Amino acid sequence: TDFDALYKTNFNYSTQLFLFYGIFIAFAVKTPTIFLNTWLLKAHVESPLSGSIILAAIVLKLSLYGIFRLILPLLPKASLDYTYIIYLIGVITIIYASFSTLRTIDIKELIAYSSVSHAAVYLIGVFSNTIQGIEGGIALGLAHGFVSSGLFICAGGVLYDRSGTRLISFYRGIAQIMPLFSILFFILSLGNCGVPLTLNFVGEFMSLYGVFERLPLLGVFASSSIVFSAAYTIYMFNRIAFGGSFSKFFEANISDVNKREFFILLTLVIFTVV
């Protein structure tokens, strides 16, 4: 595709609207947003570890690339006029995904639902038409790729391989026998919460700042993602790593992370911490 020639095309307003609806719905499936996110849960839960990592780090970010490559430069008038609809969809997605995350007991489901919530934050950031919002959306997209990949490795590549279950209710006191893993898992969990000194915080803060500049009221509701992400991530980490004595369902001789797992997780942790 010759994008230079495409960008020189001046579409009239009705054509922009028609193209905007079609292209945005396609990218909303890939983001994903509310009503179009049902495929993501099964894709994450049923796929192997490598599939979950590729899906979280690369495939979901293709919508962000497509928005920057097609929607914003080609359809500026339609994007500007329908920002409030995208914001409304984003806010509903954040709240719905967060409540769904709070009720799940499967680790991979929890990380998958949190991906939906974070994706909605960078979606509304890039449509804010502000420098801060667009840069924040890019930063949050990168940060989410590092953190979610690390969390999926922790859930599927470390915990599931050693225990044979992904249910949070079976875990307790892992920090007693896997201290090195617990430290790496803790830092990645902090990144998922968006605490300061992580790339997630920079991206989330700038995205929400861009939202507040355009529509302050919806920005207030979008900011609930900060509270919700802390709630379900702290619950997940606290129940798995601490939560009392070591769970009786597991063997006491479960090994800590090996060198391969350690260096993979350490690389993602380094990219996560600012």
Where are these regions (language model features)?
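C-terminal ends of transmembrane helices
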Residues: 31-44, 95-110, 157
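Residue-level recognition of transmembrane alpha-helices
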Residues: 57, 87-90, 111-115, 140-141, ...
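Cytoplasmic/organellar membrane-interface segments at the starts of transmembrane helices
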Residues: 178, 234-274
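Small-residue-rich segments of transmembrane alpha-helices in multi-pass membrane proteins
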Residues: 50-65, 115-126, 149, 178-185
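Juxtamembrane/interfacial segments at transmembrane-helix boundaries in multi-pass membrane proteins
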Residues: 1-37, 67, 71-85, 133, ...
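Interfacial segments of multi-pass membrane proteins
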Residues: 44, 124-129, 204-219
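Predominantly late transmembrane helices and immediately cytosolic-facing juxtamembrane segments
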Residues: 148-152, 213, 220-253
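Alpha-helical multi-pass transmembrane bundles of energy-transducing inner-membrane proteins
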Residues: 1-11, 102-114, 118-166
